[in-house]
């Protein structure tokens, strides 16, 4: 009887830990912690810091592509970029796994989406995403 009870308690604890780990890795959404833009007449670059809210980053390139899509779609939870003023011609992103890492400056990775000709603002990230290439830093 005691052995059966111990097994049930151990299984319950393991399921609870698995649920907590699942939530910490996949249950929270990424969000922007800060953003800034700089530019001239024909070139505008958006710099963004993103907090992933995960424990582990398994595929940095896939993660970078997801962040690029969220920037293009303007679909981050707490930030709306003002694309009505000017749409970026370049995007630079610093990625942090969690808020604590962001506060201490411990980035997971960083990347940029740029055009071949970085000076000319012919293409923007919203209307011409195929003209941009991913550069992992």
Kindly give the residue locations of the regions a language model identified.
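Hydrophobic membrane-insertion alpha-helices, especially the h-region
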Residues: 7-25
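Short edge beta-strands and adjacent turn/loop segments
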Residues: 26-52
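Short amphipathic alpha-helical surface micro-motifs
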Residues: 13-15, 27-33, 72-78
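C-terminal partner/receptor-binding element of secreted or periplasmic proteins
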Residues: 113-137
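Ser/Thr- (and often Asn-) enriched beta-sheet segments in non-cytosolic proteins
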Residues: 31-33, 92-94, 133
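Positively charged n-region of N-terminal signal peptides that target proteins for export
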Residues: 1-5
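Mature extracytoplasmic domains of secretory-pathway proteins
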Residues: 49-109
């Amino acid at each position: 009887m005691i052995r059966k009870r111990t097994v049930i308690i151990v299984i319950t604890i393991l399921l609870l830990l698995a649920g907590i780990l699942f939530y910490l890795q996949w249950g929270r959404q990424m969000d922007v912690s800060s953003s800034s833009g700089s530019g001239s007449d024909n070139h505008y670059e958006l710099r963004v810091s993103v907090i992933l809210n995960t424990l582990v980053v398994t595929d940095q390139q896939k993660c970078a592509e997801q962040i690029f899509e969220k920037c293009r779609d303007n679909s981050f939870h707490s930030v709306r970029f003002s694309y009505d003023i000017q749409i970026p011609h370049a995007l630079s992103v610093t990625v942090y796994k969690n808020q604590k890492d962001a506060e201490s400056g411990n980035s997971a990775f960083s990347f940029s989406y740029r055009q071949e000709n970085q000076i000319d603002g012919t293409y923007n990230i919203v209307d011409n995403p195929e003209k941009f290439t991913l550069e992992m830093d």
